[in-house]
Amino acid sequence: VAAQKARDMGPIWFRPANEMNGSWTPYYGDPTNYVKAWRRMYNIAEQLGVTAYNVFVWSPNSVSMPGTEANAMKNYYPGDMYVDWLGVSCYPPSLSATYPEDRRYPLTLMQGIKQVSADKPIMISEGGYSSTCDHQRWVREWFKLKDEEPRVKAVVWENHENAENGDRRLQSDPLALELYKELVQDPYWLDLIPDAVYSEIETRKNNSK
C-alpha cells in the first residue's frame, strides 16, 4: 500500500533504512541481510511501478561506527541496479571521537561515499555543524561542494538542537549564519520551490485518505 501511494505522489526522494553503518540503528551489523532486504524492497517497488516515478536513495553515515572492516559502508551497498542516488549523513564526529581536525568537515567527510559507486549522483541527505568544529569553515566547505564535488546535486541542513547531538541550528552562531546567507545567494541554489509542487502533493495526499 505504501509503495502504491509513493507511486501516486511521485516524484519523491525515498531514503529507507539509512545510516545502516551506525551502531545506533537496529539494522546495523548484518550487511548480508541488509543487502537482501534492500533488493527485495526495490524489486517489489519495481514490480509496482514505483521506481519509474521516484528516486531511491541509499544513505549511510559518513563515518562507520564502529570503524571495522566488517562494518564498512561499502559492505552494505546493494549494487548500482538497486540504487538511484547515493546519500550520506554528514556531521562532525563527537568530541570523544579521535579524528583529526581535517576529518570534521564536509569535503573530507564526503570521500567515503564517493568510493561506493563511480557515477551515481550524491546528496547530503542530512548534515550540519556542531560544537566540535569551526562553524564558519563548515559553512564555507558546505557551499564549496557544488564546485569541488560535482556529483553532489542536493544538500539538506538539519537545523535543530537536542541534548544528544548539541546545537546544529544556523542561528546559534551569528557569524556562521551571516556567511550562510551570503553564500546561498549564488543563483545555483534554489530560492523557492514553486507553490504548485506543494499544492499538487497536498492534493494527492488528501485524495489518498
Name each region found by the language model.
Residues 1-2, 62-78, 100-114, 136-145:
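Alpha-helical scaffolding within the catalytic cores
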Residues 1-13, 33-49, 72-78, 146-147:
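An active-site-proximal structural segment forming one wall of the substrate-binding cleft
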Residues 12-13, 120-209:
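Substrate-binding cleft of secreted/luminal carbohydrate-active enzymes
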Residues 38, 42-71, 119-132, 154-160:
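Aromatic-lined carbohydrate-recognition surfaces of secreted/lumenal glycan-active proteins
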Residues 23-27, 65-68, 95-98, 131-135, ...:
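Extracytoplasmic/secreted cell-surface and envelope-processing proteins
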Residues 85-133:
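Glycoside hydrolase catalytic-domain groove-lining segments
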Residues 2-31, 53-62, 86:
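Active-site groove signature of glycoside hydrolases
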Residues 18-19, 27, 61, 79-81, ...:
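Cell-envelope and extracellular/periplasmic
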